[in-house]
């Protein structure tokens, strides 16, 4: 029987938020932002363990109370210089301390994506549990896309047919994901699915919800808080 594990890479600085504090610790609906993702993941009976990968020397984590998640949560201080490196380091460290098999599923989720709900999480696992490759939550692109020149003038309109906006969690088997990220080398990977694609595999796109947004800019905080309040 395959088990499910979750991993949150939380070693980033969140520079686009214009705040000195890493954005995963910014207050959202009275809690650190990362708390909301942890609550959904740790409350899922299908997930055996949830790992958070921090930067070495992270001082913010210890300032908050995570005891409500203690039965399922593990903290790893092995974050790297890039997201891919952080995920890879976390995967290796997680297996050292936990009985993770090569065919077990790992769900990698953004720390700054706080509005993931339990139903959407279950949908992802249901649709991918028997899949040969794995996949990710995503939404079809609805807006018109423009290609700009260096001066921010629109050069042309890009066709949006077949284009999807990737979200997280992204769910792949442990060994496949480790192999994909290990082979990425110096290539910049903005998500785990990109590393899987580089192996010649085709991750499945599971239709998601636009409310599963990533907090990237300061104005996103108000929208995320509104979504969280309406979901309760």
UniProtKB/Swiss-Prot annotation:
Keyword Protease: no
Parts forming coiled coils: none
Gene3D superfamilies assigned to the protein according to its UniProt record, in alphabetical order: Spore Coat Polysaccharide Biosynthesis Protein SpsA, Chain A
EC number: 2.7.7.60
Cross-referenced InterPro entries: IspD, IspD/TarI, IspD/TarI_cytidylyltransf_bact, ISPD_synthase_CS, Nucleotide-diphossugar_trans
PROSITE patterns in the record: ISPD
Broad class of enzyme this protein falls into: transferase
Substrates-to-products reaction catalysed: 2-C-methyl-D-erythritol 4-phosphate + CTP + H(+) = 4-CDP-2-C-methyl-D-erythritol + diphosphate
UniProt keyword list: Isoprene biosynthesis, Nucleotidyltransferase, Transferase
Residues flagged as site, Positions MEP for the nucleophilic attack: 160, 214
GO molecular function, one term: 2-C-methyl-D-erythritol 4-phosphate cytidylyltransferase activity
Pfam families per record: IspD (PF01128)
GO terms (BP aspect): isopentenyl diphosphate biosynthetic process, methylerythritol 4-phosphate pathway
Site entry (Transition state stabilizer), positions: 16, 23
Its job: Catalyzes the formation of 4-diphosphocytidyl-2-C-methyl-D-erythritol from CTP and 2-C-methyl-D-erythritol 4-phosphate (MEP).
Family, per entry: Belongs to the IspD/TarI cytidylyltransferase family. IspD subfamily.
HAMAP family documented for this protein: IspD
Protein name: 2-C-methyl-D-erythritol 4-phosphate cytidylyltransferase
Lineage of producing organism: Bacteria, Pseudomonadati, Pseudomonadota, Betaproteobacteria, Nitrosomonadales
Gene expressing this chain: ispD
